Structure formats: structure tokens, C-alpha cells
UniProtKB/Swiss-Prot annotation:
Coiled coil spans: none
Gene: Adcy2
Expression (tissue specificity): Expressed in brain, olfactory epithelium and lung.
Name recorded for this polypeptide: Adenylate cyclase type 2
Residues in the Cytoplasmic compartment per record: 1-44, 207-600, 821-1090
Species whose genome carries this gene: Rattus norvegicus
Pfam annotation, one family: AC_N
Protein residues bound to Mg(2+) 2: 294-295, 338
EC number of the protein: 4.6.1.1
């Protein structure tokens, strides 16, 4: 908790800095990376280093007492090692307190480095004669861990390492130059030391650089994965909001599952639907009440409105009705022009459903009355309510709209049509459910509606309880109404309705709520949506950027909070704690097969270490033919391996590469992309370097070995200090320690293969350690013992070559093992993050596609783009005026007779299944390229409404040639023909004889989106009304059009037959035409289309 509090405090400071702009954001990201680096690398590595150093101190003490050395002769050693152990243990305790570690990071690094350097000088100065090779391995260890394990940055690590190596070189050079004795090899030894230190610096810097690059990549992948999760959560939230804004929850999730299955395709693994029918998302509900309401006088008012005023008025009115519906536990079903209908008792049955609908109707009448009183506009509300059973759900494949069907729904519609403006007209069934809650009076609906008379429906008017109290608005008309009498009625309406403040359609797409929800989860409503052409955009405001940064910081803090020094040793859901293998075998196989383009650089670094070993041995070893031949053969082998690895790049750079050398290009590609060639080359490369580190040790001349006193010689002979001959011979074998240093460099060469299998490197180093210890402690032990005993009277542990070599190799082996494991763990972690990121991106794409399908299922694509791409400041309602749109109504009148409710057809469900098939087949036509310009608007019962000409930019309509300007009208006629063909095919399979009746008209329309809850795209205007009348007054199996439309069709090559003058409700007498179904057209249209 302390660490989390600390991280959160830092996050708040970073967020405050982020508010300052781009520089602040960069500081915030830098701080997050530093925290991530600190907890994932610096903290665990410094802990491991302290453990290694403390373990080494304990091992030295154990070896000291195991060898039975005299305490009096090694007082300095016994003081130095326990003191260092105590200091390192104290630092270890403090480092384990993470808050202290974070604050004193640099101090701990400096103290550890100083302690190690001090230990090296103490070992050098106390314990016997100082030699040119003294403590080179220990100082090499310091140099290497300064880069790889101490939490220094690269600059500080270079400075500390240079100080370490140069101080050792300078001290030894000055001290030995002033000491009497043989100095003929001093220069070469010091130069060899310098080469060893340079190699240690290069290997350490290389290791640090690659590890930092790998960690930066892991950090980026972590951030990307977290961002993708944020985005995925957002997409899921977004699609749920979209889906629930279109459909009720009880049916939305079922449809969502099918869409996802369809988007994912066969790979998702679900069984394909073997049913010949489309899925039907319709359910039966009993005991519900249906309300139909129509705004009387709105058609006349709308004729004087501008597009913006019309859409604004409808949105405000229906937004108010939605609010009233919510208050009265009603669900709005659909908006049909200026008609509004809803149901109470869905999806959960409600005992007060009739009371809810009646109260809803009274509230609607009251709302309209307030509008009429406030504006003086003559509009009113006619409401009809009936109670019964319904089938509710969604039919078709596109432009889903939740709807209800049943005889009771039809009756409710006629209750509205047979009602009176300003009154709520109810049936006797609804009256029974009211249980006396309202006073009623005779409705006499059968007088005004023949359907009610035919079905002997007894109707009533509900008496409004508020009717006896006249509102103040009725008594005193507002001043602005009287003053504004000269204003157009639409202007007065618009100004008044603005005070209602109805929510805008799809406002939730850009809803700016808090980043954290009540359950503690982080909200993601401000993350940009998607990667599609209309979704690929940046965060739009500074506040959004700030919130997104805060959320990302919070998630990163959670990730960092879960990282500690012991995490990789504890149980993980993905990675085994000992072997570091993935539990998932497929992921393990995929990780092993990962391409490794950097492998050639690993080989290059290993070859540079080999070069350093060669230079060191050339400087100090006797120049023999075996030395030359052995290193020459090794050089040729490594150069060949290096050439094969770089062959691809070399041949790509060369313009005149021979085709015979293409196998080299393929070979380098195989090495980079396949694991087994890499493993083979790793084994060969490291085997050559490790072997050459000690190879020439087996070819020491006999004279160099026999002139030395052996272990069998009496102690008296070997311990005489004035044995000048023995000392002279011993000094001639000054190169022996450099074999040990070469072995250490050989082990380091194994560690440079960072991304190669950890277990392979461990096995190679283990084999090398066993082999080296066998040489040092067995095969060549007598040479090393004799050398040490001749050079030193009572050699200490760090002066005795055999002990020093074995301990040094073991310490380096453990250090490299820890580094290798750490590297492997984070490489695997990085791969895991990438793998999760990839999967989450695929899931995000599915969610984005789902959102797109959902939104384009209710809106045309260009309208969906408007809502997704708009700026937050653009809160205007969407509306668009078009001069030439072709509108079609295609109905199946016979379906009303076909629809029956009985036990045989599951109370009408099977009838709706057939209607679903018909509408779905009609919708299938929309996916054909030639009908891409056809926009389905809605279905009304068994009537299919569509339009063309809505996709064109209105400003471009007049710029087109007349023929092209009206081509979409021809497309609509073609679509009507296709509908007839589809219906004929269904008739053959279902043994029915349904006929299509089509009405088409063209002209100006207003398009817009209204309704915050269940937003709906619709078109309005006289063109739409006339098209509807062309259908309702039409003839089965005929396409009826107006005279103006017939003239356009004839110019496009269609033939039309005059029907004559017919009376159209609300329009008077109109001359109409039938489009000939023989489709006798000239070739002119096909030429235009081409």
C-alpha cells in the first residue's frame, strides 16, 4: 500500500505536469518509464547482486576455514570479508524497503561500488606479493556488474567503470614500477589487463544497452497492451450503449452474440446454423398495454418549417415523450412521421400497465396543451390505448427497429385513429385493467372508425383529473406569444421547445463522464473509437488528453505495483517459476519460433570477445606455432559464421550479386527466422571461444613445467625465499592467471546471446565451468600450486591461483546465470504482452466492426460518420435537405389476412417467421453493388420503405447532368422489380400467393435523426406522404408512380401506362401511372451507367 500511495502521489504530480502541455506529458511518460525500469530491472538486480556478493563472502570464509589457513597470517582478509558482509547485509535490508530504495537509489549504488573497489584493493595489498595480474578478475567483476546490475545510467556506469579499470591499471603500474625485481614482462601484463578491462567495458555496455532497449520495448508493449485494454473496454461499453439505444436489453444481447459470430467467421469455432430460416428475434408477451399517439395539425405546421426547425421540433417533442414514457414505465417502440407509439409491460410484466399508458397519454396531451397555450400554434394530441397481447422483437437483417405485432396492436392503432384531439381514447379491455383508477365517459369510437365498428369495440374517453383546474397558462397567455403573433408558427414552436432541452441523438457517443465508475472500474468513454476511416482520429480536447493520460498512468501504476524482486520467482498464471516455460504449449512453441534478426549482432559481440582473448594471449603467452595455428583456425571458423550471418545484408548492398551466392542470402534468412540453425551456431561459436580460452594451456613446453618445483617436492625446498632459480622460473609463467581471465571472458561471451534459449546458455556455461574447474583443480593443479607457492610464502585465497580461479569462475557463472534468467524472463514477458496485445487488437477490431454494423444498421454510412467524427462542440441535430430523393413504399396487403393468432401458429409467431424471411430476403438485395445507393428507411408492419438519392452530397446534385441526376430513380424501380422477384421465390417455397404493391414518388425531402433513446433516422416531406399514398391506393403486382415520376422514368427508358385520375387522401385528385413490368427499356441507361 505504501508503494501504491507513493506511486499515486507521483502520478498526481505527473498529471499536474501533463496539464502544462506536450512537455508535461513527456515528463509524465518519462517518470512512468523510470518507475517501470526501477521496479522491473534495477531493484531485482541490485537485490541479486547483494545476494551474490554476500554469498561470495560466505563462500570465501568457508573456503578459508576449509583450507585450514592460519588466522595470524590472514588477519586483513578476516577483517575485510566479515566487514564487507555486514555492510552489504545492512544495504540489503534497506534495499528491501522499496520506499527507502527509491529515495536512496544513487546512494546505494555508489556505496556498493565503493565497497567493492575497496575490497579489491584490500585483497591486492594484503596477502602477499603484489603482481601485475593481481585482482584483475575481481575488478573485471566490478566493471561488469556496474553496467549490468547496479542501477547506474549509461553515463554513470561508463564513468564508474573507467575509474575502476584505470585506477587498477595506474596503481599497479606505479607500484610495480617502483618495486625492485624483474620488469621485462610488466608492460605486456599491464597491456593485457587493459585489454581485459576494455573487453569487460564493451561487454557490459553492450549488455546494458540491449537490456535497456529490450525493457523499453517491453514498456512500450505494456503501454500498448494497456491502451488496447482501455480501448477494448471502451468499445464494449460503446457497443452496449449503441445496442441498448436501438434495442431493449432482453433481445440486444442475443443479437449481439450472432453479430460477433458472423464477424469472426468460421474461425470462431461455433457451429454453423443448419436451419434454412434466418434467426427470429421475436417473443410473445401477454398482458401489456399499447399506446398510439398522433400530433394533430403537425403536417400543416411542418409544411412551413425549414429542415432544421422540423428536425428540432420533432426531436424536442419526441424527446419529451420519451421522458414521459420513462416516468410512466412505458417503452417507446417506434416513431412513424408524427405518430408515436409505446407499450407498457415490456420486457418485464407490470400489473399497472394500463394505468401507465393512460397516465402517459394524459401527460402527452398536457404537454401539447402547454405548447399550444404558450405559442398559439393550433396543434393537439390524439391518443388511443388498448390492452392485450403482443409479439415484440426485430425482423430483417438491416436497419433494425424494435417493433410489436398482433391484432391488439392493430386495434390500438385504430383506437388512435378513431379518437378525438386532446383526449385519451381507451378500449373496454383497458378500462377493465384500470380498476376504477380514472373516470371515463362514452367514446363512440365505432362512429369515427369503421374497423372499430366492424369488430364491435366499445370505447371510452378518459376524463383528465386535471381538467377541472384550468392552468394559469390557459388563463393568461404569455406576452411573448402575443408579441410574436407576426412570427411564423414554426419559429414560435422552435423557440418554445428549446426550453425543454431534450437530449441529442447519440449524445452518449461523446458523453464525458468521470473516468472512474461507481464500482471502481475505470470508465473509458473518452477514448477515440476505432481504426476505421471514419474512426481514425485523435483525442479532441485537452481535457480528454488529460483524462486519458491519467487513466494510462493509473493502469501503469497498477502494472508497476505488481512488479517486485520476487515476482518472477512466484507462481504466475502464464510462466513457470523455475523453468520460465509458458504453461501454454502453443505460446511456448510460438516463442521458440520467433524470428531473431539481432542474432548476427550477438555473434559479432562474441567474436569481439574472442578477439580480446586472442590479443591477451598473444601479449603474454610464449609465441609458439600451436598458438598461431589454433587461433588461426578459430578465426577462420568464426569469420565464416559471421559472414553467413551478415550475408543477407552484404548481398542486398551489392548490386552485382551472383545468383550462385543466393544460397548465402537464404542461409542468413534461415538463421534469423528459425531456431535450430541459431542454436547450432550458438553452440559452435561459444564452443570455439570457450575452448580457445584454455586450449594452449595444454601445450606448455616440458622445460617450463619441469623446472618448477612440483607438489611432491619438500616444503623446505619450495618455501625458501632465496631460491632465485625457482622464482625466476615462476615469473616466466606469469601468463598462467591470464588463462583464467580468458575463461571468464569465454563465459561472458555466452551471455551476449541474450534472446537465445536460456537453458541452452545455462547448459553451455555449466559444461564450461565443470571443464575449467577440472583443469584448474585436477589436470593442471600442480602447475598452479607450484606457481603460487613459489611466488608467495603463504598465499591467501585471492593470491592462490587455483582457489582464485575456481571462486572467480563460480561467481561469474552465478552472476551470468542470474542476468541470463532476468533477460529471459523479460523477453518472455515482452512476448506475452505482444501476444495479449495482438489478441486484444483482434477483439477490438471485432468490437469496432460490431459498433460499425450497429450504427450503420440504424443510420446511413455518411450519417454514422457525422456522429462519430463530429467535435464535442458540435452538438447540433443532424438534418439535411435534399432536392431530389426517390421514395418507395412496398407493401404486402395479403399478409394482414394471412396473419392469424392460434395455437397452431404459436399465436402468430410462425406468421412473423415468414414475414422475417421476406424482409430478410429483401434486405439481402441491399448488399448487391447495383443497389448500393438504396437506403432502407424502415418497415411498417408488412410494408417496406426505402429511398435513393440520400447518399449524394446535396450541393453536387445540381452539378450533375440531368440524366445522371435522375438515375437513382431508375435504380429504385430496378429494386422494386427485384423485390417482386424475391417475393415470387418465397411464394414457391412457402406455397403462398403473396403479391407486392409498390408506390414510388420523387421530390424534395428532409432527412434527420431524432430521439435520444432509440435514435431513428427518418425522412419527412410531401414527397414521402405522396409515395405512401401511391402504395395505399395502388394495385397488387403493380408499381404506381406520380405523373412527374413517370416522365423521368420514360426519359430513362422505362414505359409507363396511365392509370387515370384517382382521389388521394389529403392531396385531392392526382393523375398516376403504372410502370410496365415487362421492363422494356432502351439501351440508353446502360450506356449512361457504363
Amino acid at each position: 500500500m505504501r508503494r501504491r500511495r507513493y506511486l499515486r502521489d507521483r502520478a498526481e504530480a505527473a498529471a499536474a505536469a501533463a496539464a502544462g502541455g506536450g512537455e508535461g506529458l513527456q515528463r509524465s511518460r518519462d517518470w512512468l518509464y523510470e518507475s517501470y525500469y526501477c521496479m522491473s530491472q534495477q531493484h531485482p538486480l541490485i537485490v541479486f547482486l547483494l545476494l551474490i556478493v554476500m554469498g561470495a563472502c560466505l563462500a570465501l570464509l568457508a573456503v578459508f576455514f576449509a583450507l585450514g589457513l592460519e588466522v595470524e597470517d590472514h588477519v586483513a582478509f578476516l577483517i575485510t570479508v566479515p566487514t564487507a558482509l555486514a555492510i552489504f547485509f545492512a544495504i540489503f535490508i534497506l534495499v528491501c524497503i522499496e520506499s527507502v530504495f527509491k529515495k536512496l537509489l544513487r546512494v546505494f549504488s555508489l556505496v556498493i561500488w565503493i565497497c567493492l573497489v575497496a575490497m579489491g584493493y584490500l585483497f591486492m595489498c594484503f596477502g602477499g606479493t603484489v603482481s601485475a595480474w593481481d585482482q584483475v578478475s575481481f575488478f573485471l567483476f566490478i566493471i561488469f556488474v556496474v553496467y549490468t546490475m547496479l542501477p547506474f545510467n549509461m553515463r554513470d556506469a561508463i564513468i564508474a567503470s573507467i575509474l575502476t579499470s584505470s585506477s587498477h591499471t595506474i596503481v599497479l603500474s606505479v607500484y610495480l614500477s617502483a618495486t625492485p625485481g624483474a620488469k621485462e614482462h610488466l608492460f605486456w601484463q599491464i597491456l593485457a589487463n587493459v585489454i581485459i578491462f576494455i573487453c569487460g567495458n564493451l561487454a557490459g555496455a553492450y549488455h546494458k544497452h540491449l537490456m535497456e532497449l529490450a525493457l523499453q520495448q517491453t514498456y512500450r508493449d505494456t503501454c500498448n497492451c494497456i491502451k488496447s485494454r482501455i480501448k477494448l473496454e471502451f468499445e464494449k461499453r460503446q457497443q452496449e450503449r449503441l445496442l441498448l439505444s436501438l434495442l431493449p436489453a432482453h433481445i440486444a444481447m442475443e443479437m449481439k452474440a450472432e453479430i460477433i459470430q458472423r464477424l469472426q467467421g468460421p474461425k470462431a469455432g461455433q457451429m454453423e446454423n443448419t436451419n434454412n430460416f434466418h434467426n427470429l428475434y421475436v417473443k410473445r408477451h401477454t398482458n401489456v398495454s399499447i399506446l398510439y399517439a398522433d400530433i394533430v395539425g403537425f403536417t400543416r405546421l411542418a409544411s412551413d418549417c425549414s429542415p432544421g426547425e422540423l428536425v428540432h421540433m420533432l426531436n424536442e417533442l419526441f424527446g419529451k415523450f420519451d421522458q414521459i414514457a420513462k416516468e410512466n414505465e412505458c417503452m417507446r417502440i417506434k416513431i412513424l412521421g408524427d405518430c408515436y407509439y409505446c407499450v407498457s409491460g415490456l420486457p418485464i410484466s407490470l400489473p399497472n400497465h394500463a394505468k401507465n399508458c393512460v397516465k402517459m397519454g394524459l401527460d402527452m396531451c398536457e404537454a401539447i396543451k402547454k405548447v399550444r397555450d404558450a405559442t398559439g400554434v393550433d396543434i393537439n394530441m390524439r391518443v388511443g390505448v388498448h390492452s392485450g397481447n403482443v409479439l415484440c422483437g426485430v425482423i430483417g437483417l438491416q436497419k433494425w427497429q424494435y417493433d410489436v405485432w398482433s391484432h391488439d396492436v392493430t386495434l390500438a392503432n385504430h383506437m388512435e385513429a378513431g379518437g378525438v384531439p386532446g383526449r385519451v381514447h381507451i378500449s373496454s379491455v383497458t378500462l377493465e385493467h384500470l380498476n376504477g383508477a380514472y373516470k371515463v365517459e362514452e367514446g363512440d369510437g365505432e362512429i369515427r372508425d369503421p374497423y372499430l365498428k366492424q369488430h364491435l369495440v366499445k370505447t371510452y374517453f378518459v376524463i383528465n383529473p386535471k381538467g377541472e383546474r384550468r392552468s394559469p397558462q390557459h388563463l393568461f397567455r404569455p406576452r411573448h406569444t402575443l408579441d410574436g403573433a407576426k412570427m411564423r408558427a414554426s419559429v414560435r414552436m422552435t423557440r418554445y421547445l428549446e426550453s425543454w432541452g431534450a437530449a441529442k441523438p447519440f449524445a452518449h457517443l461523446h458523453h464525458r463522464d468521470s473516468m472512474t465508475t461507481e464500482n471502481g472500474k475505470i470508465s473509458t468513454t473518452d477514448v477515440p473509437m476505432g481504426q476505421h476511416n471514419f474512426q481514425n482520429r485523435t483525442l479532441r480536447t485537452k481535457s480528454q488528453k488529460k483524462r486519458f493520460e491519467e487513466e494510462l498512468n493509473e493502469r501503469m501504476i497498477q502494472a508497476i505495483d505488481g512488479i517486485n524482486a520476487q515476482k518472477q520467482w512466484l507462481k504466475s498464471e502464464d510462466i513457470q517459476r523455475i523453468s520460465l516455460l509458458f504453461y501454454n504449449k502453443n505460446i511456448e512453441k510460438e516463442y521458440r519460433a520467433t524470428a531473431l534478426p539481432a542474432f548476427k549482432y550477438y555473434v559479432t559481440c562474441a567474436c569481439l570477445i574472442f578477439l580480446c582473448i586472442f590479443i591477451v594471449q598473444i601479449l603474454v603467452l610464449p609465441k609458439t606455432s600451436i598458438l598461431g595455428f589454433s587461433f588461426g583456425a578459430a578465426f577462420l571458423s568464426l569469420i565464416f559464421i559471421l559472414f553467413v550471418c551478415f550475408a543477407g545484408q552484404l548481398l542486398q548492398c551489392s548490386k552485382k550479386a551472383s545468383t550462385s551466392l543466393m544460397w548465402l542470402l537464404k542461409s542468413s534468412g534461415i538463421i534469423a527466422n528459425r531456431p535450430w540453425p541459431r542454436i547450432s551456431l550458438t553452440i559452435v561459436t561459444t564452443a570455439i571461444i570457450l575452448t580457445m580460452a584454455v586450449f594452449n594451456m595444454f601445450f606448455l613446453s616440458n622445460s617450463e613445467e619441469t623446472t618448477l618445483p612440483t607438489a611432491n617436492t619438500s616444503n623446505a625446498n619450495v618455501s625458501v625465499p632465496d631460491n632465485q632459480a625457482s622464482i625466476l622460473h615462476a615469473r616466466n609463467l606469469f601468463f598462467l592467471p591470464y588463462f583464467i581471465y580468458s575463461c571468464i571472458l569465454g563465459l561472458i561471451s555466452c551471455s551476449v546471446f541474450l534472446r537465445v534459449n536460456y537453458e541452452l546458455k545455462m547448459l553451455i556455461m555449466m559444461v564450461a565451468l565443470v571443464g575449467y574447474n577440472t583443469i584448474l583443480l585436477h589436470t593442471h593443479a600442480h602447475v598452479l600450486d607450484a606457481y603460487s607457492q613459489v611466488l608467495f610464502q603463504r598465499p591467501g585465497i585471492w593470491k592462490d591461483l587455483k582457489t582464485m580461479g575456481s571462486v572467480s569462475l563460480s561467481i561469474f557463472f552465478i552472476t551470468l546465470l542470474v542476468l541470463g534468467r532476468q533477460s529471459e524472463y523479460y523477453c518472455r514477458l515482452d512476448f506475452l504482452w505482444k501476444n495479449k496485445f495482438k489478441k486484444e487488437r483482434e477483439e477490438i477490431e471485432t468490437m469496432e466492426n460490431l459498433n460499425r454494423v450497429l450504427l450503420e444498421n440504424v443510420l446511413p454510412a455518411h450519417v454514422a460518420e457525422h456522429f462519430l467524427a463530429r467535435s464535442l462542440k458540435n452538438e447540433e441535430l443532424y438534418h439535411q435537405s435534399y432536392d431530389c430523393v426517390c421514395v418507395m413504399f412496398a407493401s404486402i396487403p395479403d399478409f394482414k389476412e394471412f396473419y392469424t393468432e392460434s395455437d397452431v401458429n404459436k399465436e402468430g409467431l410462425e406468421c412473423l417467421r415468414l414475414l422475417n424471411e421476406i424482409i430478410a430476403d429483401f434486405d439481402d438485395l441491399l448488399s448487391k453493388p447495383k443497389f448500393s445507393g438504396v437506403e432502407k428507411i424502415k418497415t411498417i408492419g408488412s410494408t417496406y420503405m426505402a429511398a435513393t438519392g440520400l447518399s449524394a452530397i446535396p450541393s453536387q446534385e445540381h452539378a450533375q447532368e440531368p440524366e445522371r441526376q435522375y438515375m437513382h430513380i431508375g435504380t429504385m424501380v430496378e429494386f422494386a422489380y427485384a423485390l417482386v422477384g424475391k417475393l415470387d421465390a418465397i411464394n414457391k417455397h412457402s406455397f403462398n400467393d403473396f403479391k407486392l404493391r409498390v408506390g414510388i414518388n420523387h421530390g424534395p425531402v428532409i432527412a434527420g435523426v431524432i430521439g435520444a433513446q432509440k435514435p431513428q433516422y427518418d425522412i419527412w416531406g410531401n414527397t414521402v406522404n405522396v409515395a405512401s399514398r401511391m402504395d395505399s391506393t395502388g394495385v397488387l403486382d403493380k408499381i404506381q408512380v406520380t405523373e412527374e415520376t413517370s416522365l423521368i422514368l420514360q426519359t430513362l427508358g422505362y414505359t409507363c401506362t396511365c392509370r387515370g385520375i384517382i382521389n388521394v387522401k389529403g392531396k385531392g385528385d392526382l393523375k398516376t401511372y403504372f410502370v410496365n413490368t415487362e421492363m422494356s427499356r432502351s439501351l440508353s441507361q446502360s450506356n449512361l451507367a457504363s
